[in-house]
């Protein structure tokens, strides 16, 4: 009997593991492209999200362009408008005006004449914003509107220069710097500032509108890519109430002037060359940008772009926050 058979068998047995591993390697190498193909498939699955993100980016670019054009038109209209308000930085450069200066007297008379309608339109604008931002009716809110309705007095003040303010100890009075009175040359410009100050009166020492202020600050931060503190949110909300009140006033008092010119008067004092800020206020031009981003309808009234259907945004989330007690101090509309 040949002895080579067992040896042959052993040799075959030694080769089988190597052959098996070689086959596995071939199979893995053959399957590798199928794994590579998975990557495009995963990308294809994420393309709807990518398209949505691209759509949001495009919408943001369109809004930014609308706001930019609206700002340019507002400031161009101010330069051409005989009744255009002086920019804030120009007001600050002027010397103080005496109480009996003709322009001061004319401004005070304009403010007194517009105060009754300003109270109505400011209250309507506040109620609209409260609905949009999910601020519920409460005793504090009712007290806010009661305070607003009780304002009766316009008081010129040389020391306030280019500012307006309210004092907690005089809740029925709005004080105007004499330069400010002389520099707001149109009904629209004056009414916007009155509505701003009336919103401060409504808020009061107890901070009745703090939830609304916080909601506006958060939304403006998203709309205009800004970080807005609580106090700046308060001032921005007052400016927004002023702009909405002016829009309502224009709608109810048609005239021969263009819509763009009359709308620009609500913003014209922000058309500054020196765009400074402080702790309480956004800079004037940043304020204008935030307002137009918050209210694109206002921007379209300046540019003449077709109006889009207005939709109510989702209410801002409600959060509770303690408000620090404020001393009796002036409340100013802007810097």
Q: Where do the protein language model's features map onto the residues?
A:
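Catalytic Zn2+-binding segment of zinc metalloproteases
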Residues: 188, 198-214, 250
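Signal peptide processing junction and immediate N-terminal pro/mature segment
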Residues: 31-47
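N-terminal secretory signal peptides that target proteins for export/translocation
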Residues: 1-16
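Active-site His/Glu-centered metal-binding helix of metallohydrolases
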Residues: 194-203, 237, 241
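Short pre-active-site segment immediately N-terminal to the catalytic Zn-binding motif
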Residues: 178-192
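Bacterial N-terminal signal peptides
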Residues: 22-34
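C-terminal capping/extension segments of zinc metalloprotease domains
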Residues: 21, 45-120, 124-127, 143-157, ...
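Post-HEXXH active-site segment of zinc metalloproteases
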Residues: 205-231
């Amino acid at each position: 009997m040949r002895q080579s058979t067992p040896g042959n068998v052993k040799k075959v047995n030694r080769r089988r593991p190597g052959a098996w591993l070689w086959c596995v390697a071939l199979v893995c190498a053959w399957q590798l492209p199928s794994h590579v193909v998975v990557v495009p498939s995963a990308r294809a699955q994420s393309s709807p999200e990518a398209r949505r993100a691209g759509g949001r980016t495009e919408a943001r670019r369109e809004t930014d362009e609308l706001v930019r054009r609206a700002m340019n038109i507002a400031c161009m209209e101010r330069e051409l408008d005989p009744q255009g308000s002086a920019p804030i930085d120009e007001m600050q450069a002027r010397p103080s005006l005496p109480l009996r200066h003709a322009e001061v007297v004319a401004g005070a008379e304009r403010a007194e004449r517009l105060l009754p309608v300003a109270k109505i339109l400011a209250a309507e604008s506040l109620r609209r914003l409260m609905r949009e931002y999910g601020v519920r009716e409460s005793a504090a809110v009712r007290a806010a509107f009661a305070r607003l309705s009780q304002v009766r007095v316009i008081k010129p003040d040389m020391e306030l220069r280019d500012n307006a303010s309210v004092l907690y100890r005089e809740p029925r009075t709005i004080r105007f710097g004499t330069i400010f009175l002389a520099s707001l040359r149109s009904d629209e410009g004056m009414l916007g500032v009155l509505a701003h100050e009336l919103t401060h009166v409504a808020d009061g020492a107890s901070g009745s509108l703090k939830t609304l202020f916080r909601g506006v600050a958060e939304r403006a931060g998203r709309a205009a890519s800004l970080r807005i503190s609580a106090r700046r949110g308060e001032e921005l909300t007052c400016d927004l109430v002023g702009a909405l009140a002016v829009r309502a006033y224009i709608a109810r008092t048609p005239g021969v002037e263009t819509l763009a010119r009359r709308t620009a008067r609500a913003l014209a004092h922000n058309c500054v060359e020196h765009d400074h800020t402080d702790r309480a206020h956004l800079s004037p031009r940043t304020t204008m940008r935030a307002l137009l981003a918050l209210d694109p309808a206002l921007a379209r009234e300046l540019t003449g772009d077709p109006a889009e259907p207005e939709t109510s945004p989702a209410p801002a989330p409600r959060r509770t926050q303690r408000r620090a007690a404020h001393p009796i101090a002036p409340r100013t509309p802007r810097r």
